[in-house]
């Protein structure tokens, strides 16, 4: 179980039919492939296979945030590409199906050692309590809270980029291998997720959210030694001394973005303490993946 939110940092994808069966795929590099099987980008190739598309396409992606930074860009890419391909075929698709299909591709087809959180929040958007069942089912429960609480929480959250990028697969593989050794800690993290949701929905002292964020980070660090490192620990301690009540490293660990909960009157001091990091302004995003435009000349 996790408490998760979408933010206003986006992955943009365009899909355009090409003459013949050749593909042009643009991301951090550009591929020109003679057919679907020759595409090197594993997610693009797998999405095309999943939907049975062989006719040539031009697929281009642009992202607000770099990859390998813990904000779910890979799964957002998968969800967005599936959504665009379904639209190209003239199909409307639900958030549930998008998330399920993205998980099928990343976890089962590509054997990535990842969970399902990123795919579901990318598809649904909003602020969600996401529950993962032993049988593979996923339940997405929106947090029902007041506009005032939402705005106040946003005022108290500050996001910093550490400048460190990393491949999450190795970290997540090790975490998966040791899961059975940390069932008590994982159950505690689930309880904290519920408590954090309750703080938001009940109108209780919002600072409790920050304290729970700190508790969850301390537990998560104990799950696997590579989740944090000396640089991350130093930044975190500096933030606490500057007035932050809690925080966490987003994503699998070892780099990416640090999120802190800090009351407004301490935030200037927090920014000074972490002047070596890059602050990234953000806001909560209520919508998940959406199709912005579909041309009239398809087919």
Where are these regions (language model features)?
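C-terminal nucleotide
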Residues: 4-53, 62, 85-113, 117-247, ...
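Glycine/serine-rich anion-binding loops at beta->alpha junctions
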Residues: 62-85, 243-258
């Amino acid at each position: 179980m996790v408490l998760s939110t979408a933010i206003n940092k986006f992955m943009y994808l365009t899909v355009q039919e090409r003459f013949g069966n050749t593909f042009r795929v643009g991301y951090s590099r550009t591929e020109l492939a003679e057919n679907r099987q020759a595409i090197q980008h594993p997610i693009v190739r797998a999405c095309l296979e999943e939907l049975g598309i062989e006719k040539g396409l031009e697929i281009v992606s642009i992202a607000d945030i770099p990859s390998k930074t813990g904000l779910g860009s890979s799964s957002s890419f998968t969800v967005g590409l599936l959504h665009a391909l379904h639209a190209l075929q003239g199909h409307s698709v639900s958030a549930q199906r998008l998330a399920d299909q993205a998980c099928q591709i990343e976890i089962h087809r590509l054997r990535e050692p990842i969970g399902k959180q990123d795919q579901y929040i990318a598809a649904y958007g909003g602020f969600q309590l996401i529950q993962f069942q032993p049988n593979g089912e996923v339940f997405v429960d929106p947090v029902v809270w007041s506009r005032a609480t939402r705005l106040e929480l946003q005022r108290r959250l500050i996001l910093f980029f550490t400048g460190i990028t990393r491949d999450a697969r190795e970290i997540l593989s090790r975490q998966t291998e040791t899961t059975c050794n940390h069932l008590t800690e994982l159950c505690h993290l689930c309880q904290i997720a519920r408590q954090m949701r309750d703080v938001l929905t009940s109108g209780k002292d919002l600072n409790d959210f920050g304290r729970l964020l700190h508790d969850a980070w301390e537990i998560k660090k104990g799950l696997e030694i590579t989740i944090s490192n000396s640089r991350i620990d130093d930044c975190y301690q500096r933030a606490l001394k500057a007035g932050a009540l809690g925080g966490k490293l987003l994503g699998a660990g070892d780099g990416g973005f640090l999120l802190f909960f800090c009351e407004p009157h301490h935030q200037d001091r927090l920014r000074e303490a972490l002047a070596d990091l890059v602050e990234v302004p953000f806001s909560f995003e209520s919508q998940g993946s959406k199709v912005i435009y579909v041309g009239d000349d398809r087919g």
